[in-house]
């Protein structure tokens, strides 16, 4: 049988694109990334978490130059971050007193920077590995993982979070963490594209993994079990202190009065929990107030847990020109309580200055980081001791780090997180933050108490379900009961290492497979 020139070209280069204009392709990629926010809280339209990466996959499958692939991935990532993390605009413009135009530029630059992760994903997918769903999903997971540590990390907007309450898929979280959930979702999305291209064989791994996750959901294995002690009554205090007043010296006493008043009727509960930095001064400056609260807690047999800036009680050392370190911390006080936890994962530019050594080169800024920055707590800290239980803690932003929370959860009976999301106003940021706490509860099989300044204050069970929830932007108290649990989920035992090993192996196999294939033409 003789083949025409056209038929021969199709066989040699079956993936040659039909000819979408580059500008239109980039726009579609940007919109696909921007739309992903609809999959997360507060919108919760989880199918978008399949459609969004599916569009990126479909745009990248045709043969093309590395430059074209990178621009498509970069556009997707930029749209994802400019829209998905637009809540940063509130903190930059409203509370940072940055002009609106400059705040928008800063958001755009942040989007371009974070978009590089998807840009390089697309480049590697185009040039290094075979173009098929397994390699695409594996690259996706590795770029999500890199966001937990590269350049201090910004682990937000993971695909897996869209499925937090879709237990037919999030049942994988206690086994291998949020990355496993992301992997199956992205693999399914890419496989559906291949199914539409009449390459149905690619859907088989997705179906197999969905059968596993659905089976786990149906049989409902109890990775952890109740400790066998009575549930603890807890009161979570939401002070609703305006962010523009919170750190004013003249408002500090008023803040303390607000929290003391809200707590007045809660003494006698097992645990009273105050939010992050609810005492807006160092412990050395609030000795009298703290003593009064501790006395009341002991008198009523209540454990009082509060966020507070903690300063080592050393004086300024003139010989070294160093100030004593200070920490964003949470402390357990009162009846049957002891322990201090110092935040490990600090917010870049908000709590510390990254790359501090560079400042020492500049004469006018040398040593200034000692005054401006919180210090990082050790990654080897003991749990808080509360009423005969071990209590693991995570402060604000660090609950977004799966491995940090996992390590803090080992050997504990339940968990707490305290936060101040007033920085982000009525945006989606606080609700995305809450969704991540739900995933951490599910991964570790532990109940979570979450106390915040303006919301969302909540109690979450070991399956990631919100049991009690306070309204946002109200001065209120959330009451409920929490259960102590023991045992370790597979994720707690092994962490993210198994899933990362599997992803790396898939990429190595895909790379080796690509090398055996004949080259195809590249389209600019």
What are these regions (language model features)?
Residues 221-498:
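Soluble catalytic domains of enzymes that build or remodel membrane lipids, polysaccharides, and related
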């Amino acid at each position: 049988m003789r083949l025409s020139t056209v038929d021969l070209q199709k066989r040699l280069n079956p993936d040659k694109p039909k000819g979408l204009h580059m500008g239109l392709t980039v726009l579609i990629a940007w919109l696909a990334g921007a739309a992903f926010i609809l999959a997360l809280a507060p919108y919760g339209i989880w199918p978008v978490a399949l459609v969004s990466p599916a569009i990126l996959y479909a745009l990248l499958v045709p043969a093309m130059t590395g430059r074209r692939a990178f621009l498509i991935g970069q556009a997707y990532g930029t749209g994802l971050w400019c829209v998905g993390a637009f809540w940063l605009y509130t903190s930059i413009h409203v509370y940072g007193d940055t002009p609106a135009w400059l705040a928008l530029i800063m958001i755009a630059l942040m989007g371009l920077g974070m978009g590089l992760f998807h840009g390089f994903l697309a480049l590697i997918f185009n040039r290094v590995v075979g173009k098929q769903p397994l390699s695409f999903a594996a690259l996706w997971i590795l770029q999500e993982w890199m966001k937990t540590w590269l350049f201090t990390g910004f682990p937000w907007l993971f695909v897996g979070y869209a499925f937090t309450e879709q237990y037919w898929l999030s049942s994988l979280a206690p086994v291998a963490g949020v990355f496993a959930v992301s992997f199956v979702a992205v693999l399914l999305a890419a496989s559906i594209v291949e199914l539409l291209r009449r390459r149905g064989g690619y859907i088989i791994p997705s179906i197999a993994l969905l059968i596993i996750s659905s089976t786990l959901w149906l049989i409902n294995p109890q990775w952890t079990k109740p400790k066998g002690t009575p549930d603890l009554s807890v009161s979570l205090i939401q002070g609703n202190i305006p962010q523009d007043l919170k750190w004013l010296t003249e408002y500090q006493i008023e803040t303390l009065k607000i929290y003391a008043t809200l707590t007045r009727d809660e003494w006698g509960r097992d645990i009273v929990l105050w939010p992050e930095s609810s005492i807006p001064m160092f412990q050395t400056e609030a000795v009298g107030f703290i003593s009064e609260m501790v006395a009341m807690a002991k008198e009523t047999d209540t454990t009082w847990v509060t966020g507070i800036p903690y300063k080592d009680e050393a004086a300024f050392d003139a010989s070294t020109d160093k100030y004593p370190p200070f920490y964003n911390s949470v402390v357990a006080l009162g009846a049957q309580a002891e322990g201090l936890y110092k935040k490990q994962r600090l917010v870049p530019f908000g709590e510390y200055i990254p790359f501090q050594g560079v400042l020492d080169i500049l004469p006018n800024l040398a040593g200034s980081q000692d005054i401006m920055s919180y210090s990082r707590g050790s990654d080897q800290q003991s749990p808080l001791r509360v009423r005969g239980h071990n209590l693991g803690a995570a402060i604000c932003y660090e609950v977004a780090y799966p491995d940090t929370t996992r390590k803090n959860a080992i050997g504990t009976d339940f968990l707490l997180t305290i936060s101040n999301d007033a920085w982000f106003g009525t945006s989606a940021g606080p609700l995305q933050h809450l969704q991540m706490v739900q995933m951490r509860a599910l991964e570790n099989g532990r109940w979570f108490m979450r106390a915040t300044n303006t919301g969302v204050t909540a109690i979450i069970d070991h399956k990631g379900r919100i049991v009690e929830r306070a309204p946002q932007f109200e001065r209120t108290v959330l009451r409920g009961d929490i259960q102590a649990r023991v045992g370790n989920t597979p994720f707690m035992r092994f962490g993210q290492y198994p899933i990362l090993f599997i992803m790396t192996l898939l990429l190595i196999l895909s790379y080796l497979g690509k090398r055996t294939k004949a080259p195809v033409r590249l389209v600019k």
